[in-house]
Structures are given as C-alpha cells and as structure tokens.
Regions:
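Conserved Rossmann-like nucleotide-cofactor binding loop
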Residues: 41
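N-terminal accessory regions of nucleic-acid-interacting proteins
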Residues: 1-34, 38
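Conserved acidic
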Residues: 26-35, 44-104, 109-373
Length: 373
C-alpha cells in the first residue's frame, strides 16, 4: 500500500501526535520517522557544443516514508510541494526540525542540493556528505553512514519490525522517466527501500529512548560509550569514580621517557603491502583475493595488548620470554647469527631490514631479509 501527495495531511495528523524531543543542543526534533529515496535512470546523449558531458541521469520516482506510510511521487514539483506542506504543518524552523534519513545521502544530495538553501553540509570526502541542514528546518541524514550496511544487509539487522529488501526486481538497463508506467513489483521495490530504513530507525528510537539519541555515524555509539565511562564533567559520584579509575589506568600506561618512546617506535612494524618475491613482475591468471571486514575493531577485542608500563627485566633469557609471553608483553633487542628463511617460498618474511641497527651480508627483498650472516 502506498499513498499520493494529497494524502499527506491525513498521514501527518496521525504522525505528529508523537510530539517532539529536545536534543543536548536545545534543538527540538519531531518524533516522526521520515525516510526518503529516489530511483533514477542513466543514459547517454550526443553532446552539444556548450556541454561535453554525455552522461545524463533522471529521477523517475521518489518515495517518502512517514512513520511507515509511504508517499510516492514522480516529479520534483510534487516533491517540493510535499516538502513545503510538511514545513508548514510541522512549523519547522532552525530550532524546530524533522530528520529525514536517506540511505547513501551523497547520491540523493546531488539531485536535491539546488532545491534548498543549506545552513550546513558536513562531508567526509569530496561529494560525500553525511548530513545536511537547511535553513528552514529539514535535517537530512545518511542512514548508510549510521549502519554501514547496504539496504539488503540492513533488513537482516531488523529484530522487531521485519521488512525485506527486494532484490532483482528493477531492471536498471531500462531507461525510465516520470511518464513511464511502473508495475506493482517495481513500486513494491521502491516502497520496501524506505520501509527498511524506517523500520531500522524505529528500532533505534525504541532502543535509545528518543530520536535525538541516535548518533550521526556508527562510531557515534562508541564515542558515547567512551564519554560516559571515561570523561567526567561533574555531577554524580559514580561518574567521578569512573573517571578516576580510567584516569589512573591511563597514567599507569604512560610512556616514561624519550628513550622508551624511541624504543617503542623501533619495535613497531607496519603491514605487508608488497608483492611476493616469487611472483613479482609476473602476470597471473585466475587469481582470487580476500579482505578482512572490520579488522581493526576485531583485533582490538581478539588480541592482547600491554596494559601496564614496561619495566626493566634483568637477565632475561629466551626461555623466560617464551614461558611468560601469554601473560606479558616483551620489548627487547634481538641479535641473530646466520639467519635464513626455512621456506624460501615464504611470501611474508618477518624480518624488516629498516629496523636493523646493523646487518652483515644481507639478502633483501623489498625491505625484508631473506638471509644474513
């Protein structure tokens, strides 16, 4: 089921009963969930003398979900009429706003950016805004940056309000315009796209308490946790105790002097980013590759790291290091004599030439030691 632009007032009558919440910055936000999306067609036409860019793109349908009810339109004029009507009905101002979530806002932004006067647009890269605030109370946010999931994957994260992202029903090779009739399946594809986002945001609202508690990005949850547990701004006693405990821990790991810092720098080694010596300069066929997802946060939880200052350990032997390596981290200078790779085909030799203070007759491949006296 979907609605037309003329059904807006009826939908808002019900949606605006939820009232508004006030953020930490004293901005009032309507407790109404808006999700926006467009479908476009791209095509190529013969360039003119004035315009050498042959690629064109046109919006042929847009959809706006308001608390789970989806309004569909085919033209930008309909969209702008709808936005003006929402502005008037919600009495929007710079201090009283609605949040409109857009999955991959950077794409839609290129189509709507000239329709509004923007107070602030924050981008993480060139043409990659994650939110934009208009002067008349519309705050567009990127739900992809919030979740780090595609729409298909986002539907799998829903626990309470289950909506499936339809896959494969839109043939993107077809050129469609606002005059192109859409089938029921094509319309359902459009509807589900905004319903998935709406359902996810609704679950976030229920989990966080209200709409103002939802952060801008996925890392916002982590930053909030750190602020709550580590940074004290006065007030309740237990928060002061949390801060003191955290502050004491940080001080206990503080680097003691410049020499220790230099030693830590010498011990640090980066990742393997070069080609394996056995295959360098060759063209290989039928190869595959893999990458680790969220590797940094994973190793922060799965691996062990020093949580105390390094202290001198006199008369430390190799056996001591091997025996205690599960409980303690060691930092030391190692002297090796007559070293050679056990497996000459090892693609990742561990010894880095640049970290050696001296090296006798080394055989080096791309900064890694294969053999030395």
């Amino acid at each position: 089921t979907y609605y037309g632009v003329n059904d807006l007032d009826t939908i808002l009558d019900e949606a605006l009963k939820n009232g508004y919440s006030i953020s930490n910055t004293q901005i009032e936000y309507e407790n109404t969930i808006f999700a926006f999306d467009i479908e476009t067609s791209s095509f190529t036409e013969k360039p003119t003398k004035e315009d050498h860019n042959e690629k064109r793109s046109i919006m042929y349908v847009w959809q706006l979900a308001i608390n789970g009810r989806v309004i569909i339109g085919r033209t930008w004029n309909e969209f702008l009429y709808l936005m003006n009507r929402i502005h008037d009905r919600c009495d929007l101002t710079d201090k009283h706003r609605i949040i409109i979530w857009v999955h991959n806002f950077s794409f839609e932004f290129q189509f709507i950016r000239k329709f509004f006067e923007w107070k602030k647009v924050f981008a993480i890269d060139n043409r990659k805004p994650i939110y934009g605030i208009t002067i008349n109370g519309f705050e567009f946010r990127c739900s992809y940056i919030l979740t780090n999931y595609s729409l298909a994957k986002l539907s799998d994260q829903l626990h309470k309000y289950h909506v499936s992202k339809m896959v494969g029903d839109l043939d993107y090779s077809l050129v469609r315009t606002p005059l192109t009739p859409l089938t029921d399946k094509e319309l359902q594809y459009c509807i589900n796209d905004v319903l998935v986002v709406s359902a996810y945001i609704k679950e976030c609202c229920e989990q966080e308490g209200n709409i103002t508690r939802i952060p801008l990005t996925a890392t916002g949850y982590c930053r909030r946790y750190v602020r709550h547990n580590c940074l004290y701004k006065g007030g309740k006693k237990h928060k002061e105790e949390q801060f003191n405990k955290y502050h004491t821990l940080m001080l206990s790991m503080q680097i003691q002097d410049v020499e220790e810092y230099k030693q830590l720098k010498r011990a640090f080694m980066g990742g393997f980013t070069h080609a394996a010596a056995n295959y360098s300069s060759y063209t290989l066929e039928n190869v595959d590759s893999i990458d680790f997802t969220s590797s940094y946060p994973y190793v922060m939880l799965s691996e062990k790291y020093p949580m105390e200052r390094f202290n001198d350990y006199e008369d430390c032997s190799l056996d001591d290091i091997l025996d205690m390596s599960e409980q303690y981290a060691f930092m030391y200078k190692l002297i090796l004599v007559d070293v050679e790779l056990k497996d000459p085909h090892n693609p990742m030799p561990a010894l880095q030439y640049s970290k050696c203070t001296s090296c006798v007759n080394p055989i080096v491949d791309n900064g890694r030691i294969l053999k030395a006296d």
